[in-house]
Amino acid sequence: MLFNFLQKNLCKAFTFNMTSGHCQQTLATLFRSTLLLSGDNTKLFTPIRPQSWTCVLNYFIYLLCSQVTPETMFKDIVSFLQANGASSACWVLPLNFTETRAPKQQVSRLPSKWKILTADGSPQPWQVYWGIPSCLAYASYVGHLAEIATDWGKVTETNTQELLNHIFDLLRIFF
């Protein structure tokens, strides 16, 4: 199920290889020259203050490959969002994440009061393929993440399938 989800949503940027054995699932993803590994017997990434989007992806993959319950997984993801919602480095996708470039909006069309979020330190408009509307103010973006974390933190669902649906909804928001 995880492999199909990742293959469908991230196949343009990642190469996947999943193996299993000895009560363990391991997922290896290759992103440029970085190899990310996750398995259920070793926690390879501890979410404190992740420095990049690939660290966030690695953590989410770790949770999905683990044998933890959906309840624990959901709680961990929400806690992670609440702890790191204001860190733009965690949620801004690399500019070359997609094969096709979305048309760029002209900077002159943006109201001057809106801050333009940048991925590499240079000013540029928000790209459509980043997953949320163009021209979004940075403060609004951070507020949106904080709101998501707060709302999902209120979920008290105990049905396993419903929790899995919530988890995949979260993944679709950011990935």
Curated annotation (Swiss-Prot):
Alphabetical list of InterPro entries matching this protein:
Helicase-primas_cplx_Herpesvir
Q: Which is an annotated Pfam family here?
A: Herpes_heli_pri
The gene it comes from is 41
- The identity of this protein, by name, is Uncharacterized gene 41 protein
